[in-house]
Amino acid sequence: MAFHPIDLDSFPRREHYLSFIGNNQCSYSMTVNVDITALGAHKLYPAMIWLLTRTVNEIPEFRMALVDGVLGVYDDMHPAYTVFNKESKTFSGIWTEFDPNYSAFLAAYERDSALYSAAVSYAPKPNTPPNSFNVSMMPWATFTAVNLNLYNGGTALLPIFTMGKAFFADG
């Protein structure tokens, strides 16, 4: 989980970074419909978490964060995701260490989900790594846009993914 500080003096996006982290603080949301046909019989939520994490780990800009006020890039990321407690109708945020081998990741995901899905606390699994990003799903709601704003002084740089109910499109 190495974090590599970025030298702002040689950073090609220095001017843009300083503008948006300073005077032009903003957030943005982007909605992308994803064709999941190829997932076939795979369980949707863990498969999507794995695919998102693999993608985040391939794109350095998705691994950028501020640590103690220093801009840098993590070597790798792990998903922090929600599990729903059907009895209390609440969710908990847990995390699973990413494994590039889908079968190994799925086994770890299933262990963590089974262990923490009955929890009523917000974050029942301890030691969420700092190199994690958020994923959630509302499988009961079909939507084509969502907007999430964090009020933290504009320093949240890591991506947040929210998925909805799968739907058929274009035939």
Predicted regions, residues:
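Flexible, Gly/Pro-enriched loop and linker segments at secondary-structure and domain junctions
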Residues: 1-32, 130-171
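Residues at beta-strand starts and edge strands
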Residues: 26-28, 46, 77
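Helix N-cap / beta->alpha transition motif
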Residues: 33-37
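Acyl activation and transfer enzymes in specialized metabolism, enriched
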Residues: 38-60, 171
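A short, aromatic/hydrophobic, helix- or strand-capping loop or linear motif
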Residues: 59-68, 118-122
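Small-residue-rich loop/turn and linker elements
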Residues: 62-95
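A short beta-turn/loop motif at secondary-structure boundaries
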Residues: 71-73, 127, 169
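Helical lid/core segments from catalytic subdomains that handle acyl or acyl-like groups
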Residues: 85-143
